Amino acid sequence: MRLQLVALLFALVFNAFSHEHSHEHHHEGDGSEILTKVGWNDHSEELHDHHEHDHDHHDEQLIRKNHTSHREIQHSRLSTLKVWVFSLSAVVGISLAPCTLLFFIPAQHANGPFLKILLAFGAGGLLGDALLHIIPHSLSPHDHSHDHHDHNHSHKEHDHSHDHSNQLRVGTFVIAGILVFMMVEQLVRIIKGGHCHSHENGHIVADEHRHLNEHDHEHSEEKKQQVEGLKDVKASAYLNLVADFVHNVTDGLAIGASFSAGNTLGWITTLTVLLHELPHEVGDFAILVQSGFSKYQAIRLQAVTALGAITGCVFSLLVSNPGSLNNDADTSAIMPFTAGGFIYIATVSVVPELLESGDHNNLSKVAKMAQSLVHVLAICMGVGMMYIVSLVE
């Protein structure tokens, strides 16, 4: 009995000692966890401080980025203003330069020999512009259709089909330009057929009819043909003004798009258009004077057609992607249609006038042959000028 009590007491004491020891270990564990938590909190504070530092640094980067973006916007506005100023200045300069040159050309009678040479030069310029510049430029393949030309055979066939369809489209619009200009001229002749003179060349036709009454009857038919010839050429002069205006629109589109791509390209395009316009404007001036306009009337009309270049330039600068507009303008109906008009004016209106010029003067056969040779050389000079411009471009 005593042994059982002693064993029970010993068990109680040992159990109490074990509980106290485990309790101490438990509290020591809690303390280590507290220390661990305290250490972790210290590390968290460091991370928080580092996060605040990163946040401040991020704010500083945002401020700097906003400042840079603001400077880029200001620079972009200045660049846009520069493009507008350069483009419009180039267009105005190209328009004024030929008109200034025209003042130094001596005024002559419609059948003057020097004016006939200018007329032949203008015919060559029209043919060269249409056949050596406008049509080849419209037929040339564009970069976007040949960027991946070597990928596979089917893509090559697609490019070939695209080029063929483009050639057909350009040829169709050239023919359309010729037919439309012919129909317009026929319409003008029909409208003017019942009148002896129009509003613009009334004095010229009236003077010619006055001379008909003064000359002998044997010369009346020849004079009547000359009067009708003046009326016919007048219609072609208006057609030439329309074609020149449309052509100037395409020049303005090219200049605006070039300056949008870069100043260097813009000035190169400006020089090319200027070299192209100088002989072109001289020929147009000769056609207008030959049609019955006075020298200063012809210069004013040439200045009016220059508004087409300004219109095209402004439109090119207003669009979002001028470069693509320039490519679309080159392959659209505008340029080949204008080329057809130039071909019609040169071959139907100007060249026949040159062929008939020797029939109305009292020159020997040798002198007429020499005059025809000079006209051919003037046509070749006009074509040659456009050939050089095409090479430079």
Curated annotation (Swiss-Prot):
Transmembrane segments: 85-105, 117-137, 171-191, 255-275, 303-323, 332-352, 372-392
Protein keywords: Differentiation, Glycoprotein, Ion transport, Membrane, Spermatogenesis, Transmembrane, Transmembrane helix, Transport, Zinc, Zinc transport
UniProt-recorded name of the protein: Zinc transporter zipt-7.1
A Pfam family per the record: Zip
GO biological process, one term: regulation of egg-laying behavior
Membership in a protein family: Belongs to the ZIP transporter (TC 2.A.5) family. KE4/Catsup subfamily.
Recorded GO MF terms: zinc ion transmembrane transporter activity
Region described as Disordered: spans on this chain: 142-163
Cellular compartment(s): Membrane
Tissue-specificity statement: Highly expressed in developing spermatids (at the protein level). Expressed in the germline.
InterPro entries: ZIP
Induction profile: By cholesterol.
Annotated source species: Caenorhabditis elegans
Gene: zipt-7.1
Highest taxon in the source lineage: Eukaryota
Role summary: Zinc transporter which regulates intracellular zinc levels. Required for spermatogenesis in both hermaphrodites and males where it resides in an inactive form in immature sperm, spermatids, but is likely activated in response to reduced spe-4 and spe-6 function. Upon activation, mediates the release of zinc from internal stores in spermatids into the cytoplasm. The resulting increase in cytoplasmic zinc levels promotes spermatid activation and subsequent differentiation into mature motile sperm that are capable of fertilization.
Organism taxonomic ancestry: Eukaryota, Metazoa, Ecdysozoa, Nematoda, Chromadorea
Lipid bilayer topology: Multi-pass membrane protein
Major site of localization recorded for this protein: membrane
Result of knocking out the encoding gene: Reduced brood size, but the majority of hermaphrodites are sterile and lay a large number of unfertilized oocytes. Defective spermatid activation. Double knockout with spe-4 results in failed spermatocyte division. Double knockout with spe-6 results in suppression of the premature spermatid activation phenotype of the single spe-6 (hc163) mutant.
Signal peptide bounds: none
Assigned GO CC terms: membrane
